[in-house]
């Protein structure tokens, strides 16, 4: 890539087309010591992969809200214990020279498990435990799957503007509160 050939992109240009979470996911999809080729097709693949993970998290939240039973059944406890294998694979990948590509593969294995081993008859405890497990793995990679916890850039910009207005009005107590 070079600027003179016209195949050079800045993060700002990429962020106009793709969410920065997609860019993060794209960059994590390769080992940090491997070269990373940028293309629109690869960014779209990263976008669909990230959406797959977020969709699984959203599905778990939906099922938690409509769960008919609270406590985990014995069969669910056995299934949940099997899902620990994916956590082990994730941790092994991260211990193997920060192999994020393999770690993401373990997350996808967990997503596949979630999609096949949960339904509207699953208990709330089972669903919550799987959700916590998914969030724990994705948070290590800096991927936000729980949109309720995500602070939007527009919210931050609004708070900055409000703080600047309070400082102009010499309302320092309010400016400090916003900070």
Regions found by a protein language model. Name each.
Residues 2, 6-179:
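Structural preference for alpha-helix termini/caps and helix-kink/transition segments
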């Amino acid at each position: 890539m070079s600027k003179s050939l016209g195949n050079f992109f800045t993060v700002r240009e990429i962020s106009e087309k793709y969410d920065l979470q997609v860019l993060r996911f794209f960059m994590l999809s390769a080992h940090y010591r491997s070269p990373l080729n940028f293309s629109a097709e690869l960014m779209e693949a990263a976008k669909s992969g990230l959406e797959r993970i977020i969709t699984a998290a959203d599905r778990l939240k939906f099922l938690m809200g409509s769960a008919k039973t609270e406590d985990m059944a014995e069969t669910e406890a056995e299934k949940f214990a099997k899902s620990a294998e994916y956590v082990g694979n994730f941790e092994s990948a991260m211990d193997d020279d920060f192999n994020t590509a393999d770690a993401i593969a373990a997350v996808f294995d967990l997503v596949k498990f979630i999609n096949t081993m949960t339904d509207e008859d699953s208990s709330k405890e089972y669903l919550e435990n799987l959700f916590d497990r998914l969030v724990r793995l994705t948070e290590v990679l800096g991927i936000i799957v729980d949109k309720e916890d995500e602070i939007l850039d527009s919210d931050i910009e609004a708070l900055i503007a409000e703080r600047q207005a309070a400082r102009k009005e010499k309302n320092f107590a309010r400016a400090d509160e916003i900070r």
